[in-house]
């Protein structure tokens, strides 16, 4: 099985950016832990981060026919990007939306997600463990529907 992990804008600053909200783990720490977890499940995990919407859209397109599922933390694009939503719909790959913080307990503009409507599920608010929960949920979905 092959899963793509996508991280959007400013997530490259994890561990430095607002640690009271996002914690002290770096993106590299999160990716390494999730890669180890995926390997234990015999899953290949590809990780990609970009601050650019078009680069994320391109990477989603490249996943078509190559990946069985996608984990996506689109960062602020979650609340603004119809392009990412349409790319995910276009490739028809099951995906789970993931966030470190509980977006529903934050500013009002973070309460709406353009991605959630088509997602297998949404995991938020558990810090770095959100990624592990999202991977487990996605794998469970993929195995049930294989």
From Swiss-Prot:
Binding residues for substrate: 73, 79, 86, 100-101, 110
Q: How does it assemble?
A: Homododecamer.
Q: Its annotated pathway?
A: Metabolic intermediate biosynthesis; chorismate biosynthesis; chorismate from D-erythrose 4-phosphate and phosphoenolpyruvate: step 3/7
- What Enzyme Commission number does this protein have? 4.2.1.10
Q: What is this protein called?
A: 3-dehydroquinate dehydratase
Q: Which organism is it from?
A: Synechococcus sp. (strain CC9605)
Where, by residue number, is the active site?
22 (proton acceptor), 99 (proton donor)
Extract the coiled-coil ranges from the record: none
């Amino acid at each position: 099985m092959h899963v793509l992990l996508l991280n959007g804008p400013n997530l490259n600053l994890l561990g430095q950016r607002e640690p009271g909200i996002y914690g002290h783990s770096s993106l590299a720490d999160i990716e390494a832990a999730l890669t180890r977890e995926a390997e234990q499940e015999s899953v290949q995990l590809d990780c990609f981060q970009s601050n650019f919407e078009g680069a994320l859209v391109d990477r989603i397109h490249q996943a078509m026919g190559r990946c069985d599922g996608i984990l996506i933390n689109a960062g602020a694009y979650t609340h603004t990007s119809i392009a990412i939503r349409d790319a995910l719909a276009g490739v028809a790959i099951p995906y789970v939306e993931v966030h470190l913080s509980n977006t529903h307990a934050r500013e009002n503009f973070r309460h709406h997600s353009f991605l959630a409507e088509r997602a297998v599920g949404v995991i938020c608010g558990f810090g770095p463990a959100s990624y592990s929960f999202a991977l487990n949920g996605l794998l469970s979905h993929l195995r049930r529907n294989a």
